[in-house]
Amino acid sequence: MDFSKFLADDFDVKEWINAAFRAGSKEAASGKADGHAATLVMKLQLFIQEVNHAVEETSHQALQNMPKVLRDVEALKQEASFLKEQMILVKEDIKKFEQDTSQSMQVLVEIDQVKSRMQLAAESLQEADKWSTLSADIEETFKTQDIAVISAKLTGMQNSLMMLVDTPDYSEKCVHLEALKNRLEALASPQIVAAFTSQAVDQSKVFVKVFTEIDRMPQLLAYYYKCHKVQLLAAWQELCQSDLSLDRQLTGLYDALLGAWHTQIQWATQVFQKPHEVVMVLLIQTLGALMPSLPSCLSNGVERAGPEQELTRLLEFYDATAHFAKGLEMALLPHLHEHNLVKVTELVDAVYDPYKPYQLKYGDMEESNLLIQMSAVPLEHGEVIDCVQELSHSVNKLFGLASAAVDRCVRFTNGLGTCGLLSALKSLFAKYVSDFTSTLQSIRKKCKLDHIPPNSLFQEDWTAFQNSIRIIATCGELLRHCGDFEQQLANRILSTAGKYLSDSCSPRSLAGFQESILTDKKNSAKNPWQEYNYLQKDNPAEYASLMEILYTLKEKGSSNHNLLAAPRAALTRLNQQAHQLAFDSVFLRIKQQLLLISKMDSWNTAGIGETLTDELPAFSLTPLEYISNIGQYIMSLPLNLEPFVTQEDSALELALHAGKLPFPPEQGDELPELDNMADNWLGSIARATMQTYCDAILQIPELSPHSAKQLATDIDYLINVMDALGLQPSRTLQHIVTLLKTRPEDYRQVSKGLPRRLATTVATMRSVNY
């Protein structure tokens, strides 16, 4: 039997019994299941007895071993107690040793201090004695004119003097030593100049060593600067006396300076510890000592160029300077972080500072330049067709000038002149809009839209309308170009001047700007050539405005901007004026006919058969000539509007949707949304005709019964024309014709649902008492 399963964690009694019976299936099958069960029980009892016996034996052995374990534990406790006592004793010994050692070390320190003082005193005495010895021998040494020996003596005297600081005659000795150094410098100066001029490396190294030892390195560098500065200044003088233009002279100067840079760097690297810094100072001093100075040369060059060319010439000069600056930057860039950035910044300032006054007033210069160029763009011509042509051609000229101004701003100010640029652009657009408006007024006069003779014959002339449509298309080009240009301007400003915008700044205050900018500059080493910023220090208010613009562009995105809001609004108004011109070119001839209605004598004069009018049917009357002309003119409008308004022209479509026509639909009119602009124009002209007709009718002082019927016939004719064109007659016109047709005895009843003032006016005209 397998008794090992009793030890399993998942032991199941039923499963074990079933397994035991399955093992003895033969006996169970023969009907001896009870016997088999009895056998299993007996085996289990025997197994239990064996287990009990084993447990008793194990327990007995454990009880026998317990006293031994207890004894071991007791012994361990005694050993731990003894160890604790020993640790306490060791701790006391260590504490005592530390106290004894501390006292010993204190004594040693005091002894060492005494020793150091004694050595210092001995050295001081030796140096003091050395000063006396050297002072006595120095005159003899100078007679040898051996610079190395004299330098060694002076170095010894200098070291001795450091030990004599507290002596009463210390200052006198300092003066004496400086006088000796001056004598040495005077003695060596011819050789120094010769060494630097001939680029003698070994001899120059000797002088560097000598002057370093006697603390006269700045004086030695002054000789170096003077030697090479003289050569560069002479080259500039020669250029100035030549017949070359100023930009060529500047190019020659910068070539000489850049050549000197590369030559001197190679030589100075062998002689000086900081060759780049030394040569940078040479260039800084040379640029500052030029005669005539660069600012005066630039001033003369700009003045000679005149107002029309001053900015162009200035940019030519600046391009030469920028090319030179780029060459220096490339030369310094590989090891820029190793150089003295203060000196690099001074060099950058020395190169660019002559242009600072012009950069600060760039906005004014650009505005003057743009206005001069805009004045050269003709818009006004003798013939209307020529004016229209010039207006169309002026669009590309206008935005060509604006784009060129942006390029100049980037080239000359690196984006810092953005505020001045925006101001100049606004002036440019204002000038253009003013000229455009004047041209529109001139076209109106040439087309005689403002002064149509009262007695002129009614005739169709669509030339003015055709020209007006071309002008509207030009306005569409202006609006489209303005949107594109504004987007490009925003992107250009952000990409160029965006580097000046600190990531941490918020445009709440100027102080916040400057604080964040200073913090950023401390946190990251930057390239002074790329970070040149003339505006922040010299015009902080304009710089703050620039930061506002950049912050807005960055936060809201360059597509959501308002840089040219005023010019855009002005161009929109210009488009509106062009719409008015086109509208007037069509409508004013109708208006001229309608305004004559109130002055016609026939309204209050009895016609032939006046007494029979009441008996005559309405269709016996025919519309008068004035309304027939107007009706025929309006009927011809679709044919004349369609070709010009619905042609495939995106600029024209843009302008037509941006403009607003006069005489909009009356409130409450159910009009379908018309995508066809020709229908919109037709509706506007029709409504203008009806409203003007109504106003003219109400100005008639008196109507005879016949005239009332005639006028009603005229109005019905116009209403039929409107119906034929699919247009709704105005409510006022319908009311008037109703009142004109109403019999006097029915007038009170009919007029109850109509506007009171209108009913009263018509009643007065008809002499109806109600």
UniProtKB/Swiss-Prot annotation:
Compartment annotation: Golgi apparatus membrane
Q: What is its main location?
A: Golgi
Q: How does it sit in the membrane?
A: Peripheral membrane protein
GO BP of this protein? glycosylation; Golgi organization; intracellular protein transport; protein glycosylation; protein localization to Golgi apparatus; protein localization to organelle; protein stabilization; retrograde transport, vesicle recycling within Golgi
Write the record's keywords in alphabetical order, separated by commas. Answer: Congenital disorder of glycosylation, Golgi apparatus, Membrane, Protein transport, Transport
Keyword set includes Oxidoreductase: no
Tell me the domain of life: Eukaryota
Pfam families documented for this protein: COG7
Would you name any one GO CC term? Golgi membrane
Q: Which disease annotation does the entry carry?
A: Congenital disorder of glycosylation 2E: A multisystem disorder caused by a defect in glycoprotein biosynthesis and characterized by under-glycosylated serum glycoproteins. Congenital disorders of glycosylation result in a wide variety of clinical features, such as defects in the nervous system development, psychomotor retardation, dysmorphic features, hypotonia, coagulation disorders, and immunodeficiency. The broad spectrum of features reflects the critical role of N-glycoproteins during embryonic development, differentiation, and maintenance of cell functions.
What family does this belong to?
Belongs to the COG7 family.
Per the entry, what this protein does is:
Required for normal Golgi function.
**Assembly mode:** Component of the conserved oligomeric Golgi complex which is composed of eight different subunits and is required for normal Golgi morphology and localization.
- Record PANTHER family: CONSERVED OLIGOMERIC GOLGI COMPLEX COMPONENT 7 (PTHR21443), CONSERVED OLIGOMERIC GOLGI COMPLEX SUBUNIT 7 (PTHR21443:SF0)
Q: What is this protein called?
A: Conserved oligomeric Golgi complex subunit 7
Species for this entry: Homo sapiens (Human)
